A protein has these predicted regions:
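C-terminal beta-signal and adjacent terminal beta-strands/loops
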Residues: 660, 737-747, 770-839
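Surface-exposed extracellular loop regions of Gram-negative outer-membrane beta-barrel proteins
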Residues: 318-319, 323, 548-593, 613-638, ...
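Short, acidic Ser/Thr/Gly-rich low-complexity loop/linker segments typical of extracellular
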Residues: 49-59
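Short, acidic, small-residue-rich periplasmic hinge/interaction motif at the N-terminus
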Residues: 29-36, 41-46, 73-79, 89-137, ...
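Membrane-embedded beta-barrel scaffold of Gram-negative outer-membrane proteins
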Residues: 365-369, 586-653, 793
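Transmembrane beta-barrel wall of Gram-negative outer-membrane proteins
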Residues: 242-265, 278-317, 341-372, 441
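Gram-negative outer-membrane beta-barrel transporters
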Residues: 511-515, 615-617, 637-743, 836-838
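Periplasmic N-terminal accessory/gating domains of Gram-negative outer-membrane beta-barrel systems
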Residues: 80, 90, 116-211, 222, ...
Length: 839
């Protein structure tokens, strides 16, 4: 494995070094109408699907192929896009400066406040990079997963954890509307399509912590996505073995009305059919969303966002076989199934936004949104398993075969779960800009309606085959002996309505210093009233950014922190048996983040080194455990904890003219649950908390601190792009991910007793892209290909190194009552073909 990885990295390094320097060089500066530099503006080449971002002084550089007419697009949020055509000669260096004009519907001064945010903890991502990214779960989320502090050990899911949190601690906004994650989904293969459609995206901002008061009440991260406002007619069509995507956009009525529509279909059967569990898979995931924008007058705009998705997952398992153990002690679990699982998830969202600008300094938004989801989970799965020891001796005739029986048994899993939720939001947000100082405020009323039906149980049938089983007892009928037991039984029906109110006020002040250095201070207060327990929570937050004026050095230092309350949505207040915990409270953390950006040049190319150190004191959290992507909370338990770590990211032109980046993170994440303990007998022997033996319990000993389920000591990710010199229509996109193992519990241990550690997660996905048509292509008159702007053919190899990554464990007992965790693996290597057409 190490040799393969070293060879791969050596190949990529040589490819980057071997770039042909005979290309032409285009450089210049991007400024606004006041001749102020626009930093982090996107400079993209349409024909090559490559691009760079400007530095803090608005400068950019691009190495371009010669003797080819290329189209450059200059874009930045809040500005009108600019387009230029260039044609360079061999060895030519040409300067091209561009002035971006403010949107008519955007306050000119508001752009300054947006750049001040860049000096804080928000990271911008280029949505175009997600279009050709090799991914199964989702384009935008896969880009987020490559950032420092972000952890995802499941390529089938779009979910991720950030700096020791869990899936429920991440905020996602689309055009200012909060998006919610599915409730009943238990595994990545059931999840389907994420909300964000990368084809519709204009701007992406992400923060891994320390975000300002304007963002909501979650403890880990915020992903803020803004959809495009079209200015011309365009469309795209994507076809692949995993599904299809289509989108259309345009303007009508002298630019007063614009539309943006996208639809997606996803079928992951080719990925699921190569997994360990064999059977009939029928996953069908579909969604459609649209954004309509109407300019009522010069001061008032109106937009409507609509979304509907239908995700269906059907599985009729037949058999499964998996090995576990060590080199000289290997065990095999064979399972034969009957039954089926049928899951259905329907989600809808509508949001109406009015944006009123009474003058050049004031911006008022009013957003009304309604979210609805109906999810059902039904299954009856009967499994008969056989656990055996595998012969590992070299040269043995039985090598690789099962040579002894260690246990047999059967189980039956049953569920009839249904979850229905409605969320209504009435939201006002305001912003006043005066010079370079920005005042923001907001107020929201929210109504949550939940109807939750829980009916699930597991039955284990030892039937005298798997031990221990009840011994014969004099005077007791065999039918009364507990050979048949419900290992788990949950039944409940909860109907709940909650009224919530939250708001914030936030001030950003910019202080220019005498030496042309700059300090930006952002301070705010967020308040939240949670109707479930009728309590108010206050969350003060502050951030400071300092940009010194150093000759030849481009540095920004940041310090941010504050209080972060997270009121439970619903999942956190539901006990494992389905009942609701009445005395629930909001989770609370105190965070401090110290970081900085250093922009420099190496090999005559621009780079940015970002580093952050953070400490999060978890003053009040709810313990939980994770199985695949399903989180089960211990709602009636309380814990304190901490997360601390270091994050690093190097972003720049590893290959001249194309952005790539690498992220490295170190983290320690622990907690101490109130009242947790373990048992010891009279001989001092430790007993499990689920103690059922006849040995007398002599004492209880506090357990103390332990690792949280999301603890991952080291994680590394790489997003790499390359192209062939003098043939830039051939391109490579690659993502590499490594993460050390995280804690896992067996099926009987309590949450605070980590049973073992998952193996490290290691994965490489690579896509080979050929651009078949670009805007410079010409065809005969009447040829329908004249309507095609760009066409790409991509061959994607998922899990290039064919590494078996563990997503969960199947726990069984042998004849000696020892629990064995048999690995459940994620997808092996397989190939996908994708055709992308842009009109």
């Amino acid at each position: 494995m190490r040799v393969r990885l070293l060879i791969l990295m050596l190949f990529l390094s040589l490819a980057a070094i071997a770039q042909n320097e005979s290309n032409g060089l285009l450089y210049g500066k991007v400024v606004d109408e006041q001749n102020m530099p626009v930093d982090l503006a996107n400079v993209a080449v349409s024909e090559l699907s490559i691009g760079v971002t400007t530095d803090s002084r608005g400068r950019y550089e691009l190495s371009l192929p010669v003797d080819t007419t290329l189209t450059l697009n200059f874009t930045f949020v809040g500005f009108q896009s600019e387009q230029r055509k260039v044609r360079l000669s061999k060895g030519e260096k040409r300067k091209l400066d561009v002035v971006l004009k403010s949107n008519a519907t955007t306050l000119p001064d508001a752009v300054i406040s947006d750049r001040a945010i860049d000096a804080s903890s928000l990271t911008r991502l280029n949505a175009k990079q997600a279009t050709l990214l090799p991914s199964i779960g989702g384009g935008i989320e896969n880009l987020v997963k490559t950032l420092p502090g972000v952890i995802s050990n499941n390529e089938l899911s779009s979910q991720y954890t950030v700096r020791g949190g869990n899936f429920d601690e991440n905020l996602i906004y689309v055009n200012g509307v909060e998006i919610y994650r599915p409730f009943l989904v238990g595994s990545g293969q059931q999840e389907g399509l994420s909300f964000v459609n990368s084809r519709l995206v204009n701007n992406i901002e992400f923060s891994a912590g320390g975000f300002a008061a304007e963002y909501g009440d979650k403890m880990s991260s915020v992903l803020d996505v803004t959809y495009k406002k079209p200015r011309e007619t365009a469309a795209s069509l994507t076809l692949s073995l995993l599904g299809a995507e289509v989108h259309a956009e345009g303007v009508l009525g002298k630019d007063k009305f614009s539309y943006l529509v996208g639809g997606r279909y996803k079928n992951t059967a080719i990925a699921l059919n190569v997994m360990d569990t064999k059977g009939s898979y029928r996953p069908n995931f579909t969604d459609v969303q649209a954004l309509f924008h109407y300019k009522i007058n010069d001061r008032l705009d109106c937009s409507l966002l609509g979304y509907y998705s239908k995700n269906q997952y059907y599985l009729a398992p037949e058999s499964s076989s998996a090995d576990a153990g060590f080199v000289n002690s290997v065990f095999r679990l064979d399972v034969f199934f009957e039954g089926q699982e049928v899951d259905d998830y329907a989600t809808g969202l509508g949001a109406l936004t009015f944006d009123y600008k009474p003058n050049e300094h004031l911006d008022l938004k009013f957003i009304t949104s309604a979210y609805s989801a109906y999810e059902t989970e039904t299954y009856d799965i009967f499994g008969e398993y056989y656990l055996g020891q595998v012969e590992t001796s070299l040269g043995s005739e039985q090598q690789g075969n099962v040579i002894s029986n260690m246990g047999t048994g059967a189980y039956l899993k049953h569920a009839r779960n249904a979850f229905y939720v409605q969320v209504y939001n009435f939201d006002h947000k305001g912003m006043r800009v005066q010079d370079r100082n920005v005042l923001k405020w907001g107020l929201r009323y929210q109504r949550q309606n939940v109807d939750d039906v829980v009916n699930e149980w597991n039955m284990i049938d030892s039937a005298g085959y798997s031990l221990p089983h009840s011994m014969d007892q004099v005077g007791v009928m065999p039918a009364l002996l507990p050979d048949l037991s419900l290992d788990m039984f949950h039944r409940a029906h909860n109907v709940l309505g909650i009224n919530n109110v939250d708001g914030f006020v936030q001030q950003s002040l910019t202080f220019p210093l005498h030496d042309e250095s700059e300090i930006v201070v952002t301070a705010g207060l967020r308040a939240n009233y949670w109707g479930y327990n009728k309590k108010m929570y206050a969350s003060p937050r502050v951030g400071v950014a300092y940009k010194p004026n150093l000759e030849g050095q481009d540095l920004v230092f940041r310090l941010s922190g504050g209080v972060y309350h997270q009121t439970p949505f619903y999942r956190e207040i539901r006990n494992r048996d389905g009942s609701l915990f009445k005395d629930a409270k909001a989770q609370r953390s105190y965070q401090v983040i110290l970081g900085g950006d250093y922009k420099f040049r190496a090999w005559d190319r621009p780079f940015i080194l970002t580093s952050e150190a953070y400490y999060k004191y978890l003053a009040h959290v709810i313990p939980y455990d994770v199985d695949n992507v399903r989180i089960r909370y211990y709602a009636d338990q309380r814990a304190k904890g901490y997360a601390m770590g270091l994050d690093f990211k190097i972003n720049g032109e590893f290959v001249k003219g194309i952005d790539s980046w690498a992220s490295l993170s170190f983290m320690r994440n622990r907690e101490d649950v109130e009242g947790d303990y373990y048992l010891v007998d009279s001989e001092g022997k430790k007993l499990p908390f689920y103690h059922h033996s006849d040995a007398a319990v002599a004492d209880t000993i506090p357990l103390g601190w332990h690792y949280r389920p999301s603890n991952q000591l080291v994680s590394f990710s790489l997003f790499f792009q390359d192209y062939i010199p003098n043939a830039p229509t051939w391109k490579v996109n690659m993502t590499l991910t490594f993460g050390t193992g995280m804690p896992v519990n067996d099926n009987e241990s309590d949450f605070y007793v980590p049973f073992k550690t998952y193996p490290p997660y290691r994965r490489v996905d690579i896509g080979f892209v050929k651009q078949l048509i670009n805007e410079g292509s010409s065809f005969s008159k009447g040829n329908p290909l004249n309507y095609v702007k760009n066409m790409f053919l991509s061959v994607e190899v998922f899990n290039l190194l064919n590494i078996s990554n563990t997503v969960s464990y199947t726990w069984v007992k042998d004849i000696y009552n020892t629990s064995w965790g048999i690995n459940s693996y994620l997808t092996p290597r397989y190939v996908n073909v994708k055709l992308v057409t842009e009109f």
